[in-house]
């Protein structure tokens, strides 16, 4: 059974998703628990393959139907893809359980449809990170996209329009990637990624390869909401179903970023002119994302919309880390993918909890959040501090590695941008003028908000501190000091804004809110929602405390060959 763990990561949630509606017909809750159980099994398999790759020091190759590549499709799991699989399945499991209270009043068809789409979204995301075949990646990309469109459309109000807009733009992105695959296949005659890496060498300076890279870059840029290709994201995050929004916002844009990493650093290599040019463009767009995303967040009054634009800025951090082009910049980018997934998921979990309890997320009617939802407020605070980059949160270390890489590469401009991007969070990440007193009603949510805010600022020992640390370290070693300045300024902006969040939650008077789902006690939410929020908050701290171990024992063991020479 253990040897089949790679395929079970995808097969378990796929089977459960296909059977979900049938089981829900007999018992409306049975199908949902089937999907939740399958995701738990997928998480167990992901942990197993991660342990196996780390102990053996070798990548796992699983041939589908025992067809040897390059003719057959294979799953390839190295430390990086295994970490991504664990990240996806863990957050997926948390959010799947978290969604249960939202479904209590729904009929079997609605519940079954929701969890069918949710299971398929997990399948698509997991498949994208473990497949070793270019066309197979496209198939999983479409599975991810179609299920994501459906979950967004289930959010009500303007969600159908948001999903339709995302579908139109997302289809362009997927089509561009498919065109890229066609060009690469025409040049090399293979779809296997490892085989492609060997056969593409004579074409690395050719115009068809440049066109293929451009299509791949734009296609995945759309999917990861890279500035200025992010137009679909604000409405998609804002109107997505509150149960699934944390999974969509936390993970869905990170997997396309991983795909760019896989192609540029592991298959093509970064030492040829075309990829170097692409990384330079990526860095420029990353700078634009940090600045424009921050500015746009300042102008928002809707909680989710602010977080959507902040995600544009955070994707900019990842882009800058990759553009720095050295080991520490790379580590900072990957670490920020992991940390931001937890931080953003934590924030959206709390938002969903507020919406579940009060029926609204109007920032001017949530006074006293720290008194009503204390744990949620603390978690948001930790996430915010981590995103700002306050040590020892995880966000600090990812930004630190970005800055160090920029410094070592002599790219000081990136440092300036990273600093500016962090400062924006003080003014535009989450405007909580009406969150006073919520800690009394939703203690767990308040704690979670506090943790998330601290992590987003970058307060140690949360996760956000460490990701920013590695980003700065990469910029420093690369001599790219501008990146370091950008990281520092962005962190200051984060700090200014998120400390204001704490002021609103813990100091301001309570606002008059009508509770549509009343829950007494410190948790302030049903256990199915409180436990995932608590796990997200703890995850931010764990990623911070063990950031060095994650980098040394996991990420460095899966570095691209270019950094090992």
Sequence positions of predicted segments:
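Transmembrane helix-loop-helix hairpins at membrane boundaries of multipass inner-membrane proteins
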Residues: 1-7, 18-116, 194-198, 556-561
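C-terminal ends of transmembrane helices
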Residues: 17-27, 94-106, 149-158, 162, ...
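Alpha-helical multi-pass transmembrane bundles of energy-transducing inner-membrane proteins
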Residues: 26, 113-120, 124-208, 222, ...
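Short aromatic-rich membrane-water interface segments that cap or initiate transmembrane helices
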Residues: 65-83, 198-212, 276-280, 408-413, ...
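Helix-coil boundary and interhelical linker segments in multi-pass alpha-helical membrane proteins
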Residues: 76, 126-132, 188, 262-278, ...
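Short helix-boundary/re-entrant hairpin motifs in multi-pass inner-membrane proteins
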Residues: 162, 216-281, 308-309, 394
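Predominantly late transmembrane helices and immediately cytosolic-facing juxtamembrane segments
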Residues: 227, 344-348, 408-409, 413-417, ...
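Cytoplasmic/organellar membrane-interface segments at the starts of transmembrane helices
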Residues: 240, 373, 432, 439-446, ...
């Amino acid at each position: 059974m253990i040897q089949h763990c790679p395929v079970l990561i995808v097969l378990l949630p796929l089977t459960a998703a296909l059977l979900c509606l049938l089981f829900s017909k007999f018992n409306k809750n049975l199908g949902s628990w089937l999907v939740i159980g399958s995701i738990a099994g997928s998480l167990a398999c992901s942990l197993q393959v991660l342990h196996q790759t780390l102990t053996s020091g070798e990548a796992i190759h699983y041939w589908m139907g025992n067809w040897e590549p390059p003719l057959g499709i294979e799953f390839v799991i190295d430390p990086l893809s295994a970490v991504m699989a664990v990240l996806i399945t863990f957050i997926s499991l948390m959010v799947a359980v978290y969604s249960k209270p939202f479904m209590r009043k729904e009929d079997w068809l609605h519940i079954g449809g929701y969890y069918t789409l949710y299971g398929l979204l997990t399948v698509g995301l997991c498949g994208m990170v473990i497949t070793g075949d270019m066309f197979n990646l496209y198939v999983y990309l479409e599975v991810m996209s179609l299920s994501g469109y459906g979950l967004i459309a289930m959010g009500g109000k303007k969600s159908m329009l948001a999903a339709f807009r995302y579908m139109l733009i997302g289809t362009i992105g997927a089509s561009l990637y498919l065109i890229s695959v066609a060009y690469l296949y025409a040049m090399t005659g293979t779809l296997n990624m490892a085989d492609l890496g060997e056969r593409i060498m004579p074409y690395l300076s050719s115009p068809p390869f440049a066109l293929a890279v451009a299509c791949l870059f734009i296609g995945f840029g759309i999917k990861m909401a890279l500035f200025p290709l992010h137009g679909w994201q604000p409405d998609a995050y804002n109107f997505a179903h509150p149960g699934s929004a944390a999974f969509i916002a936390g993970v869905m844009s990170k997997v396309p970023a991983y795909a760019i990493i896989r192609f540029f650093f592991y298959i093509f290599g970064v030492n040829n002119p075309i990829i170097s040019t692409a990384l330079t463009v990526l860095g420029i767009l990353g700078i634009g994302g940090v600045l424009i995303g921050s500015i746009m967040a300042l102008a928002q009054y809707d909680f989710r919309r602010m977080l959507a634009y902040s995600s544009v800025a955070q994707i900019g951090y990842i882009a800058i880390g990759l553009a720095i082009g050295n080991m520490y910049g790379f580590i900072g980018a990957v670490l920020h993918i992991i940390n931001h997934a937890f931080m953003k998921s934590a924030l959206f979990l709390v938002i969903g909890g507020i919406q579940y309890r009060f029926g609204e997320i109007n920032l001017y009617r949530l006074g006293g959040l720290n008194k009503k939802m204390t744990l949620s407020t603390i978690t948001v605070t930790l996430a915010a501090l981590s995103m700002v980059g306050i040590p020892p949160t995880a966000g600090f270390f990812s930004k630190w590695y970005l800055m160090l890489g920029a410094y070592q590469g002599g790219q000081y401009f990136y440092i300036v941008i990273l600093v500016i991007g962090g400062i924006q969070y003080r003014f535009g990440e989450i405007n909580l003028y009406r969150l006073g007193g919520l800690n009394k009603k939703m203690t767990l949510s308040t704690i979670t908000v506090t943790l998330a805010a601290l992590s987003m600022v970058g307060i140690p020992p949360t996760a956000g501190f460490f990701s920013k640390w590695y980003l700065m370290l990469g910029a420093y070693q690369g001599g790219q000091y501008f990146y370091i300045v950008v990281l520092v300024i962005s962190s200051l902006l984060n700090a200014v804004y998120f400390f204001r969040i704490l002021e609103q939650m813990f100091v301001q008077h309570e606002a008059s809110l009508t509770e549509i789902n009343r829950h007494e006690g410190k948790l302030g939410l049903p256990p199915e929602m409180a436990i995932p929020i608590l796990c997200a908050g703890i995850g931010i701290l764990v990623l911070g405390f063990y950031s060095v171990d994650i980098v040394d024992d996991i990420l460095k063991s899966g570095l691209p060959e270019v950094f090992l020479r």
